[in-house]
Swiss-Prot record:
Substrate binds at Y120. The active site is at D62 (nucleophile). Pfam families: PseudoU_synth_1. Belongs to the tRNA pseudouridine synthase TruA family. This is tRNA pseudouridine synthase A. The lineage of its organism: Bacteria, Bacillati, Cyanobacteriota, Cyanophyceae, Acaryochloridales. The keyword DNA-binding does not apply. Formation of pseudouridine at positions 38, 39 and 40 in the anticodon stem and loop of transfer RNAs. Its EC number is 5.4.99.12. GO terms for biological process: tRNA pseudouridine synthesis. It catalyses: uridine(38/39/40) in tRNA = pseudouridine(38/39/40) in tRNA. It comes from Thermosynechococcus vestitus (strain NIES-2133 / IAM M-273 / BP-1). Homodimer.
Length: 284
């Protein structure tokens, strides 16, 4: 944890730990005429400090993507004690955005560029019976049984530093497709399949394209060798389907000295333990 930082005459930089349900947002980044997470948070802060602010996030999540542990920074000219900011902002924010915590950080601390890693989780709900409570948070995938062990095995070679242009959607201004993948996992918990990737950064659309291709391996439509060849040979044209955004969540962001305990991020995620509720219909 960081030591306390005194505010300067030019303002105090705050780190914010943010949770949001992305269903009704057009992503994080401010867009003219669209409802975005960045805009609603900036409006809430500006209404308190009476000056415009810019809130910078560690990861710019796409339309419909959720966050349990998004981290952002903002510089404010205000005498408000740091510990009061979450309560003040939550009273002004819509119900689908929550400030979980705030911390004072040095003036040069940057939510995006100071980060060492980001961790995303993609969740599939595989029972044939729909679940209204899981619908906003998962991809309801019940069309074919998934070989989760095969999916987990084919993910492992991704660990390391690789060109991952096969999982890079068009529309990004990023100059390269190098990604350092630090950890991967794929596991089943009852009717849920959870895919997690931790990396130094993520390409535009990377997780959803990766999951879309991985599911093809799990259902037997594509071989493990084909999956590996596609990303190693950068065959972007063969990655034709992106998984829906509803199943994707930014779990957390890591820093050399984190302003927040990681537990604050992970505890915010609902932990569903679901067995099949329609065994007579189950195809798994």
């Amino acid at each position: 944890m960081m030591t306390a930082i005194a505010p300067s005459q030019s303002g105090q930089r705050l780190a914010l730990l943010i949770q949001y349900q992305g269903t009704h947002f057009h992503g994080w980044q401010r867009q003219v005429g669209q409802r975005t997470v960045q805009e609603v948070i900036e409006q809430a802060i500006a209404s308190v400090v009476n000056h415009p602010v810019s809130v910078v996030a560690a990861g710019r999540t796409d339309t419909g993507v959720h966050a349990a542990g998004q981290v952002a920074h903002v510089t404010v000219n205000s005498p408000i004690p740091v510990h009061r900011w979450p309560g003040i902002l939550n009273a002004r924010l819509p119900a689908d955005v929550v400030i979980r915590a705030a911390a004072a950080v040095p003036p040069d601390w940057h939510a995006r560029f100071s980060a060492l890693w980001r961790r995303y989780r993609y969740t599939l709900y595989t029972d044939p019976c729909p679940n209204i409570f899981l619908r906003p948070w998962t991809w309801h995938y019940y069309y074919a049984p998934l070989d989760v062990a095969k999916m987990a095995a084919v993910l492992q070679p991704l660990v390391g530093r690789h060109h991952l242009s096969a999982f890079h959607r068009s529309g990004s201004n990023r100059a390269h497709s190098w990604v350092e993948v630090q950890a991967v996992s794929c596991q089943r918990r009852g009717a849920l399949v959870e895919i997690e990737v931790q990396a130094s950064g993520f390409l535009y659309g990377m997780m959803r394209l990766l999951v879309g291709l991985l599911v093809q391996v799990g259902q037997g439509q594509r071989s493990p060798a084909s999956f590996t060849e596609i990303w190693q040979q950068e065959q972007r044209h063969l990655v034709k389907y992106a998984a829906p955004p509803s199943g994707l969540c930014l779990l957390g962001v890591g820093y050399p000295e984190s302003p927040f305990p990681l537990a604050l991020c992970t505890e915010a995620m609902p932990q569903f333990q679901l067995a099949s509720v329609c065994p007579e219909l189950s195809i798994a």
